UniProtKB/Swiss-Prot annotation:
One of its GO terms (cellular component) is cytosol. InterPro entries: rRNA_ssu_MeTfrase_G (IPR003682), SAM-dependent_MTases_sf (IPR029063). This is Ribosomal RNA small subunit methyltransferase G. Signal peptide: none annotated. Transmembrane segments: none annotated. It is found in: Cytoplasm. It comes from Bacillus cereus (strain AH187). GO terms for molecular function: rRNA (guanine-N7-)-methyltransferase activity. HAMAP family: 16SrRNA_methyltr_G. Belongs to the methyltransferase superfamily. RNA methyltransferase RsmG family.
Length: 239
């Protein structure tokens, strides 16, 4: 996906980009590749691939959810900033918090935010299991997002405790989404979530399947969740 295709495909979806926003994506790409030489941020470094599989793929969430309001968003395990930083570039009014367990990635994100001149962004070095217990952030976000972090039964325990009641958990998934939903239904129920919508589409050019799950937070998450670091992965909430 070259820059012209990136721009025109987003415009078709009602997301026009200014020259400044296109410049921000260019700076993002250059910074990602530069830092990737000294630390492992991504296996994808070829320009057209980064624009398709990182930038465009992240923004697809906005094809199925309206980001036009100044929502507070928490991105769990964003790594090099996906999906929330591409969304923040497209929708500058969003208030973004990223939680990541690796300090090196947080250092990269702080540097990136300066280079991109982003405001209303916060980067927290923490495990999602610990972060989700903290006063002030627990059940505080309009939207919590994650892209390819863990299977749904595990991911729900990391994300739903952070979503305010009435808010939305957006899980960005690949081709195994149906199976993950089947295995993750019980976790959603326990944690106060309800799957409202699943949208399936093909990522352009490479035609790989993507699924975007919109999960509404209906009830407060029981206090015992999330459990201590590592437990959700070892012992997922499954029947």
């Amino acid at each position: 996906m070259n820059i012209e295709q990136f721009q025109s495909m987003l415009e078709e979806k009602g997301i026009p980009l200014s020259s400044r926003q296109l410049e921000q994506f260019e700076i993002y790409f250059e910074t990602l590749v530069e830092w990737n030489e000294k630390m492992n941020l991504t296996a994808i470094t070829e320009k057209e691939e980064v624009y398709l599989k990182h930038f465009f793929d992240s923004i697809t969430a906005a094809f199925y959810y309206d980001f036009s309001k100044p929502f507070s968003i928490c991105d769990v395990g964003a790594g090099a900033g996906f999906p929330s930083i591409p969304l923040k570039i497209c929708f500058p009014h969003l208030k973004v918090t990223i939680v990541d367990s690796l300090q090196k990635r947080i250092n990269f994100l702080n540097h990136l935010a300066q280079k991109l001149e982003l405001s209303d962004v916060a980067f927290c070095h923490d495990r999602a299991e610990t972060f989700g217990k903290k006063e002030g952030v627990r059940e505080a976000y309009d939207i919590v997002m994650a892209r390819a972090v863990a299977r749904l039964s595990v991911l729900s325990e990391l994300c739903l405790p952070l979503v305010k009641v009435g808010g939305t958990f957006i899980a960005m998934k690949g081709a195994a989404a149906n199976e993950e939903i089947e295995n993750g239904k019980y976790a959603l129920e326990v944690l106060g979530g309800d799957l409202k919508e699943m949208s399936t589409f093909q990522l352009p050019f490479e035609e790989s399947e993507r699924n975007i799950l919109l999960i509404e937070k209906k009830r407060k998450t029981p206090k015992k969740y999330p459990r201590k670091p590592g437990t959700p992965n070892k012992l997922p909430i499954e029947k």
